[in-house]
Design a protein with these regions (language model features):
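C-terminal lid/capping helical subdomain adjacent to the catalytic/cofactor pocket in oxidative enzymes
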Residues: 2-4, 8, 33-38, 385-429
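A short, basic/flexible loop-to-alpha-helix module at the beginning of a structural domain
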Residues: 19-40
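Beta1/beta-strand and adjacent pyrophosphate-binding region of the FAD-binding site
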Residues: 35-51
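Glycine-rich FAD pyrophosphate-binding loop
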Residues: 61-80
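Dinucleotide-binding Rossmann-like beta1-alpha1 core, especially the glycine-rich loop
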Residues: 85-161, 165, 171, 307-308
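Short beta-strand to alpha-helix junction loop
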Residues: 95-105, 132-138, 176-194, 204, ...
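Active-site substrate-recognition segment that forms the wall
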Residues: 119-122, 242-243, 247-248, 252-397
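Helical element adjacent to the flavin cofactor pocket in flavoenzyme catalytic cores
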Residues: 175-247
């Protein structure tokens, strides 16, 4: 029913820009908002990436009426479909951090869900390799951290053991993480989405949350059809075509989450963390009939990421990446519509070869082809230590019924079901 309501609203709203210009001239914005079509809803989830879908499913399973709003034509077009598709064990993150807790819990939930719902996945294990003497102590730190986080089966291997396990590998020592794995992210999202819809959740695509305000009956969410925002760029500010009045709003918009939160006009922007964006390219291994590796191969973590690593997909295709390219502040249109530059610069491959050959010396010149790129939403910039996930409720920003998720980078995929569980328990009763 609500989907039909939104469709009728879009059909009535062909002159949004002109009405907004007139409103500005008349200084009558509040009156125009009062005349705007309104719809009372229970829960609104902003963003249909893997975290947003998992949150929608969890809320729907608990009997809540859920509307998911996604600016793109379909689900999972952003960070969720542009990552390594790795199920992480939980050994990189400081003990008791949200990343550590949600990764370890999420990994167990994810393996169980995939097994029970036929989602393609494989627990293939990971080797984190020390290729220089200075790396060996870092392996010990990761071992201690992972053990404290409750990661099972971790052990340090001598180089000859690791190279016997992976003949193409070169290293001095390695940390084996047997509980790491891979998953078909699209199939996972499709399964979670189907279950959410089966329990009453509604997914509305090509629809953008452009802001909100606080009224006596709670937070009001401003919504517009995505194509009208593109048409308004340069001509006038976007104007809401529909106002939603929800009991609960969960901002899972990924790269766009901080920008949307700032548009809510109800939050002190000082509580919204500064955002940084790390673009990363992947290159695929060509001219090979079989994978040179059977496990995930990771170097010691680097500034901004986990290093250029070896990832396998479920068809045994090999990809290397991502690298780290810090990009500037996102532009106006990209922030609203989640439209970003995902092109792969072919010349970046020259930096890949020496990085990969540190642990895979037999990599041949010309064997890497451009794959895809992704952008990671970060809360710490170049040269800074990684920052934990941020999940803000009323206790932080003072707005009842609003939950903001910031900096949901890796291990966001692994953590998705645990994050959803946490939000449903803490904020949905």
């Amino acid at each position: 029913m609500l989907r039909h309501m939104l469709q009728r609203t879009w059909e009535r709203s062909t002159s949004i820009c002109s009405r907004w210009i007139i409103s500005n001239k008349m200084n009558n914005q509040s009156q125009l908002l009062e005349r705007n079509p309104k719809e009372i809803v229970d829960c609104v989830v902003i963003g249909a990436g893997v975290v947003g879908i998992a949150v929608a499913r969890e809320l729907a399973l608990r009997g809540r009426d859920v509307l998911v709003i996604e600016s793109a034509p379909t689900f999972g077009t952003g960070t969720s479909s542009r990552n390594s598709e790795v199920i992480h064990a939980g050994l990189y993150y400081p003990p008791n951090s949200l990343k550590a807790v949600f990764c370890v819990r999420g990994r167990k939930l994810l393996y169980n869900y995939c097994s029970n719902h036929g989602v393609p996945h494989k627990q293939i294990g990971k080797l984190i390799v020390a290729t220089g003497s200075a790396d060996i102590q870092k392996l010990n730190v990761l071992l201690d951290r992972g053990t404290e986080n409750g990661v099972e089966g971790l052990r340090i291997m001598e180089g000859y053991e690791a190279m016997r396990m992976e003949p193409e590998l070169q290293c001095l020592k390695a940390l084996l993480s047997p509980s790491s794995g891979i998953v078909d992210t699209h199939s996972l999202m499709l399964s979670l989405l189907g279950e959410a819809e089966n329990h009453g959740a509604t997914f509305c695509y090509n629809t953008t949350v452009i802001g909100g305000h606080l009224n006596r009956d709670g937070i009001h969410i401003h919504v517009s059809e995505s194509k009208n925002i593109e048409n308004c760029i340069g001509g006038c500010p976007p104007y809401p075509e529909l106002t939603l009045i929800p009991n609960l709003v969960v901002n899972c918009a990924g790269l766009s989450a901080p920008y949307i939160a700032k548009r809510f006009n109800v939050i002190d922007i000082r509580v919204i963390p500064t955002s940084y964006y790390a673009r990363g390219c992947y290159f695929t291994l060509s001219n090979t009939t079989s994978s040179p590796f059977r496990h995930l191969i990771y170097p010691i973590p680097e500034d901004g990421g986990l290093g250029v690593h070896v990832t396998l997909d479920l068809d045994d295709h090999v990809k290397f990446g991502p690298d780290v390219e810090w990009v500037g502040e996102l532009d106006y249109l990209s922030s609203f519509l989640n439209k970003f530059d995902y092109s792969v610069c072919a010349n970046r491959v020259e930096k890949f070869y020496p990085e990969i050959r540190r642990y895979y010396p037999n990599l041949k010149d010309g064997s890497l082809e451009p794959g895809y790129a992704g952008i990671r939403p970060k809360l710490s910039g170049p040269g800074k230590s990684p920052v934990d996930f941020v999940i803000q409720g009323e206790d932080i920003h003072g707005v009842h019924g609003l939950v903001n998720l910031f900096g949901i980078e890796s291990p966001g995929l692994t953590s998705s079901m645990a994050i959803a569980e946490h939000i449903a328990f803490k904020f949905a009763g």
